[in-house]
Swiss-Prot record:
The gene is SNAP29. Residues 186-248 form the t-SNARE coiled-coil homology domain. SUPFAM superfamilies: SNARE fusion complex. SMART domains: t_SNARE (SM00397). PROSITE patterns: T_SNARE (PS50192). PANTHER family: SNAP25 HOMOLOGOUS PROTEIN SNAP29, SYNAPTOSOMAL ASSOCIATED PROTEIN. The keyword Disulfide bond does not apply. It is found in: Membrane; Cytoplasm. Keywords: Coiled coil, Cytoplasm, Membrane, Protein transport, Transport. The keyword Metal-binding does not apply. This is SNAP25 homologous protein SNAP29. It comes from Arabidopsis thaliana. Belongs to the SNAP-25 family. It is a peripheral membrane protein. Residues 40-52 have a biased composition (Polar residues).
Length: 251
């Protein structure tokens, strides 16, 4: 059976075609639902897509193309918001690392002053008193600065990016567009390709930022462990010095 309006060619006049079935991708959600309902309801009673006219099928294809474009652009927007939050997190991690380093440096200064006090306490007690020396289980060292320790973003090696599918050099397979696709749909596809390219680049950037976060957290965890050891040692030595001072005061 020949479809209705078989003499009508949707590709003769792009303006007329756009007027017939062009949809605004920025319409309200209610309008989108109404359009989708109209498309799906028109397919069921007539026996599916096989029995639709060329104009109806073309209109439905344009609708799906616009929906795909909006979905891809929505994903891109979410990725941009994640990147913004990740950037703030990286800044906070760098500031936290600086605070840990400054605190660690203070333990070195405290060790220097404590050593001077221990020497003075050791000399006190009279001529016949035995020289007192504090017990030290470990030396106090400052923050360890490793090579390549930089807040700058590190670049993931090529193999890792290829495994993740984030290598910008990997181009998607070219798709041959059927001749039936009009200029409007080609415009939508171009928008989708552009958004997908930006999304791919964003995902690669987010992966780099995630690696940087993991590296910073691991480094700071090791620094905190080292700082804890120094703090425990200083606490032990301060207790010894206080005991020595109380002993001298009782004499």
């Amino acid at each position: 059976m020949a479809p209705k309006n078989s003499s009508w060619n949707p590709f003769d006049d792009e303006k007329e075609a756009a007027k017939s079935f062009s949809l605004n991708p920025f319409d309200d959600d209610d309008d989108d639902k109404e359009v989708e309902k109209r498309f799906t309801s028109s397919l069921k009673p007539s026996g599916g897509k096989e029995n639709q006219t060329v104009q109806e099928l073309e209109s439905y294809a344009v609708y799906n193309s616009e929906e795909t474009t909006k979905t891809v652009q929505g994903c891109l927007k979410v990725a941009e918001e994640i990147r913004c939050d990740a950037s703030k997190t990286l800044v906070m991690l760098n500031e936290q690392g600086d605070q840990i380093t400054r605190t660690h440096q203070k333990t070195v200064d405290l060790d220097h002053h404590l050593s001077r006090g221990e020497k003075i306490l050791g000399r006190l007690g009279g001529v016949f008193s035995r020289t007192w020396k504090p017990k030290k289980s470990r030396s106090i060292t400052g923050p360890v600065i490793t090579k390549g320790d930089s807040p700058k973003r590190k670049v993931i090696d090529l193999k890792t990016r290829e495994k993740l599918g984030l290598n910008p050099s990997l181009k998607p397979k070219s798709k041959t567009l059927p001749e039936a696709v009009d200029a409007y749909q080609k415009t939508q596809i171009a928008k989708q390709d552009e958004a997908l390219t930006d999304l791919s680049a964003l995902l690669g950037e987010l992966k780099n930022m995630a690696v940087d976060m993991g590296t910073a957290i691991e480094r700071q965890t090791n620094e905190l462990d080292h700082l804890q050891d120094n703090a425990d040692e200083l606490n032990y030595r301060v207790k010894q010095s206080n005991q020595r001072a109380r002993y001298l005061l009782r004499k």
